[in-house]
Amino acid sequence: MGKVLLELHSVPWNEEGLSDNARLYSFLEFVSPKIEELKYRKLLLEKLQTHIREVVLDAELQVYGSMYIGTTLSISDVDVSLKSPRVGELEKRRVTMVLRKYLDADADFHSSARVPRINLVDVSGIGVDLTFGNDKACRTAELQKAYNEEHPIFGRLLMLLKHWLFERDLENVHHGGIASCALSYMLIGWLEMRFHKKGIDSEVQPIRALLQKFFYFWGVEWTYELFVLRPLTGQIVPKLQKGWLNEVQPNLLSIEDPIDRNNDIGKQSFQISMIKAAFVASANELLSDKTWFSTFAITEDEMFLCKQFENVINTKRSLVEGYDSDTESDELQAGG
């Protein structure tokens, strides 16, 4: 299991003399979207709203997820909800048809999902997850953005951990992996338990050490069979008390949703045994001064995505330059 990893040598984080923090932050900068890509994502949202308004005239979109929180990676999807007005099944299907016409002929409408959604992929390779009236996800994003503003180390760690999951193909909750929301709360709960409740400043800790301790905690120390995590307060609640013990698979991850305390965010991660093994392996790897950075790598998938995005940008740039040249030529002829 896992994606194809690339062994790159001429990269900034392999330079000699870098501290551990500098290497990790250099890697993080590399896997984060550049200014041009961030602008493109905003334009993509504008296009999305324009097309949706062909069906829903006064449609208002609300961004949530990593783009709202400030933890976007180049591999991240654009998460957006049709905030208002509320629309019925017919309008959702008409929106799907419009998006198939303009953005992605293979746009997929999941009408039976807990939160109905349309998934599509832009020509740039950037994925879009459009949901309808997803108030809970938007409130979650607001909560996590506030936490990130108070504790910036949270965002940096979260981005590295999201990439770590992506490398190992463990980020897809539909395949039993860990969703971004669950990962975020695992990190918040751990930071609260181990640092903030004890009055310890997590911001001054070496980031390599934080990653190692996080992996060790969730790979070795946490008793999945017995406990539920209450993330914002770093509390531990017995599964039996919540009525969340799954007798068929008692070791499932359980996280109480701060927005809806009756919702278990972690229960869909049915590959938790495999994920725990990966946590333990990385916890051990990060202890080695010689090989610790092999915990992170660039994947073939994201290099392909990067090239796909560059091709789109270069094509548009060529069209603009061609238009400018034609305009200048026409003006010269007119002047002559």
UniProtKB/Swiss-Prot annotation:
EC id: 2.7.7.19
Gene Ontology CC, one term: nucleus
Reactions accelerated catalytically: RNA(n) + ATP = RNA(n)-3'-adenine ribonucleotide + diphosphate
Family per similarity comment: Belongs to the DNA polymerase type-B-like family.
Subcellular location: Cytoplasm; Nucleus
Modified residues (Phosphothreonine): T327
The protein, known as: Poly(A) RNA polymerase cid12
Top enzyme class: transferase
Essential cofactor(s): Mg(2+); Mn(2+)
InterPro entries: MTPAP-like_central (IPR054708), NT_sf (IPR043519), PAP_assoc (IPR002058), Trf4-like (IPR045862)
The PAP-associated domain, residue ranges: 209-263
Species, as recorded: Schizosaccharomyces pombe (strain 972 / ATCC 24843) (Fission yeast)
Any one Gene Ontology BP term: regulatory ncRNA-mediated heterochromatin formation
Lineage: Eukaryota, Fungi, Dikarya, Ascomycota, Taphrinomycotina
Quaternary structure and interacting proteins, as annotated: Cid12, hrr1 and rdp1 interact forming the RNA-directed RNA polymerase complex (RDRC). The RDRC complex interacts with the RITS complex via interaction between ago1 and hrr1. Clr4 has a role in mediating this interaction.
MF term (GO), any: RNA binding
Location of Phosphoserine modifications: S325, S329
Chain residues that bind Mg(2+): D77, D79
Its biological purpose: Has a role in the RNA interference (RNAi) pathway which is important for heterochromatin formation and accurate chromosome segregation. A member of the RNA-directed RNA polymerase complex (RDRC) which is involved in the generation of small interfering RNAs (siRNAs) and mediate their association with the RNA-induced transcriptional silencing (RITS) complex. RITS acts as a priming complex for dsRNA synthesis at the site of non-coding centromeric RNA.
